[in-house]
Amino acid sequence: MLRSSFTQSRQLLLSPARSRTAAQWLPKAGASNRLAGQRFFADAKPPVTGAPTPASPSSESPIPPESVPKPSPAAEAPPPPPPPPAPARKTGRFRKFLLYLILTSGFAYGGGIFLALKSDNFHDFFTEYVPYGEDCVLYFEERDFYRRFPNTLRNQNRAPKDEGHTVTIPSKSGLSWKVADEESGADVSQKGPHMSALDNGEKAQLKPGAAKPEEKVAAVEKAKAESAAKEQSSDDKKKVQEEPKKPAAPAVTPIEFATVSEGDEEVVQELVKTFNDIITVIGADENAHKFSGAVNKAKEELRTIGEKIIAIRNEARNAAQEEIKQAHATFDESARELIRRFEEARAHDAAQYREEFEVERERLARAYQEKVNTELQRAQEVAEQRLKNELVEQAIELNRKYLHEVKDLVEREREGRLSKLNELTANVNLLEKLTTDWKEVIDTNLKTQQLQVAVDAVRSVLERSTVPRPFVRELVAVKELAAGDPVVEAAIASINPTAYQRGIPSTSQIIERFRRVADEVRKASLLPEDAGIASHAASLVLSKVMFKKDAVAGSDDVESVLLRTEHLLEEGNLDDAAREMNTLKGWAKILSKDWLSDVRRVLEVKQALEVIETEARLQCLRVE
């Protein structure tokens, strides 16, 4: 580990990355050269050129000049340059990005397709805004349809669609507008009515399904007027341009367009459009009157074709209505047959169900009858077994009585001989019991007396001491004697630790201290709660001249409270005296606070001692 760590640190210092951070690690320019020349403890020592070779026993012997090896040119050559640094490893970020993009797109498309198949609103959003979303959803819907209906693609006996015979018109059939060469030598490549005849025909052509006969006639008349106006304007231009030529022949009446009264069929409209285009081309020629007969004949044939198409359509409609009527009749007949079969099947099923019901009812009746018979047989067997058991019990009881009588006879005979021994044993047992009970009574009385003595010791310590004296040892003795008594332990725990650690004053000390406190309270009896120095001085002076008065029952002034407290203390009633002093307020209560604390501790100790004495008396009563 040490070798690898030193080697890695040296390679890091010599690597190209170290040159970029040289300003941070090595502030001097020659630091890298010094580090390159250093040798670490874990590296092998490089061979030094020209250094003396250590002598060995074999090298010290003389070597002939012939055997001395000549220096090879390779040894004198400079050391090879260090290998180039390894190329940086490709991170493959683009491949990872492409992989994550493909996975994310796949999950997104999969989730979108799943939600689109479950929700109609999301289906509309997904198929409308997501590329290829509609194709994907359609593919999965088809798969689901084929999964639920696997026989969809089988046995497809559909009638072939009757699209009719395709009508094709050869390119060189029909009439042609070019009959002979034009004598006037007009250039047909110039712009004129003949160049826009197709446009006029397209403008005049309406939609097959929406055009009415009146609209068709109006469109034809409009096209005639436009063609005549354009022809007239072209003739005027020619006259202006060709003034030296001969005057042109008068304009020929244009050929009317072909119309079909009820040509709402698409084929008829296409045929009329083509024929009108031909008429427009012919009308643009000066020799249009030569083809008027052929055009009129073609118009008649076109009308005849339209009438035939209308007749064929009416025949097809009538045939379809007949087929529909036959289908309705067949359907009604099939429905009646289906209802009849349904009634027959229902009647057959009802009869079969009734027969099965009767068979099942008989089977259940037999099963219940067998069950009742089995229950009766078992009840009879149980009754017989019960009688047998009663007989056996009576026999056992008779045997027991016989044995008991025999035993009584034997015992009577034995009692006559061993009665004195039994009486002696009973008397000894009674004596032992009485001895044990009296021993417990004596132990309990002894413990109670010891507890009473310990309590008297505590009381004597409290009453005979002239100064407050601790009574920890006496209290510990009381607690040890009353071990396990929860009442005594609770009473001892209720005593303030300060009371038995420092002691409590006696009754005479409390009375003496009360008299000193009463003088101070009288001096401060006239002070308000927020009194200052002047108030204290005034209260001190007035307290000297105040007259003492008798205690008035129910009066709450300071003098009355002090007099009542003093009388109670003289009677030995510390509890009521403390209650009276506790009714003081203001500075009087603050001055008597310490005295009240001492009285409370004395009362707590006395109350605890009274509880312990009462518990000791109760134990004595329980023993008696």
UniProtKB/Swiss-Prot annotation:
This protein's GO CC annotations: MICOS complex
Localization annotation: Mitochondrion inner membrane
Bias type Low complexity, positions: 46-61
Residues in compartment: Mitochondrial matrix: 42-96
UniProt entry tagged with the keyword Membrane: yes
GO-annotated biological processes: cristae formation
Biased composition annotated in UniProt, kind: Pro residues: 62-87
Source organism superkingdom: Eukaryota
Name of one Pfam family that matches: Mitofilin
Biased composition (Basic and acidic residues): 212-246
Chain segments carrying region Disordered: 42-89, 156-250
Coiled coil: 295-440
Topology versus the membrane: Single-pass membrane protein
The keyword Transit peptide is annotated on this UniProt entry: yes
Parts of the chain on the Mitochondrial intermembrane side: 118-624
Ranges that cross the membrane: 97-117
Family statement: Belongs to the MICOS complex subunit Mic60 family.
Assembly mode: Component of the mitochondrial contact site and cristae organizing system (MICOS) complex.
Known role: Component of the MICOS complex, a large protein complex of the mitochondrial inner membrane that plays crucial roles in the maintenance of crista junctions, inner membrane architecture, and formation of contact sites to the outer membrane. Plays a role in keeping cristae membranes connected to the inner boundary membrane. Also promotes protein import via the mitochondrial intermembrane space assembly (MIA) pathway.
Descriptive protein name: MICOS complex subunit MIC60
